[in-house]
């Protein structure tokens, strides 16, 4: 449970002990966030999503930073292209990520002197099992009209593949990206332009 700081610290310590340290943290944790317009979101759902996303990220980074300072490591956060161009009905996904983006900039600025780099990847629509499940549910956000309208916004005229995201994360975590910090890299097929 990423909302429990004791549990997160224990897991981080166990991983560091097993592998002799930690040099990269990739935060790709997430859950099925409902697509809702702002006016339709009740406060309990809002608080639950913010707690899981923002506080979960904070707990992970707070427990991992000492290890990253030792290894001069890297943080890679999986974010959303909705940061660049807001998709209506996606505030529950985008709002916490906007907060986390600023926390990453803070880490990049404050811990750069310790060799820690902090970056994110802003995902567009990625062709995954979750995406197909949402389409099959045939809700109003993922119907054929939505599919066509999104496809029309993409410069590459296709959805992304998981390996394209993974390759970007591996690059950002590697020494090849050793002079990149505080940035959000779009992997969105040109959605943001």
Please report, for each region that a protein language model flagged, where it lies by residue:
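Substrate-binding pocket helix/loop in short-chain dehydrogenase/reductase
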Residues: 36-38, 45-48, 150
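Short, small/polar-rich loop/turn modules that mediate ligand/substrate recognition or access, typified
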Residues: 112, 117, 180-182
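C-terminal substrate-recognition "lid" of short-chain dehydrogenase/reductases
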Residues: 67, 158-187, 192
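The beta1-alpha1 cofactor-binding region of Rossmann-like NAD(H)/NADP(H)-dependent oxidoreductases
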Residues: 1-10, 43, 163-164
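Catalytic loop of short-chain dehydrogenase/reductase
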Residues: 74-100, 104-113, 125-126, 152
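Conserved NAD(P)H cofactor-binding loop of Rossmann-fold oxidoreductase domains
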Residues: 28-34, 190
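Short, flexible catalytic-loop segment of classical short-chain dehydrogenase/reductase
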Residues: 101, 123-137
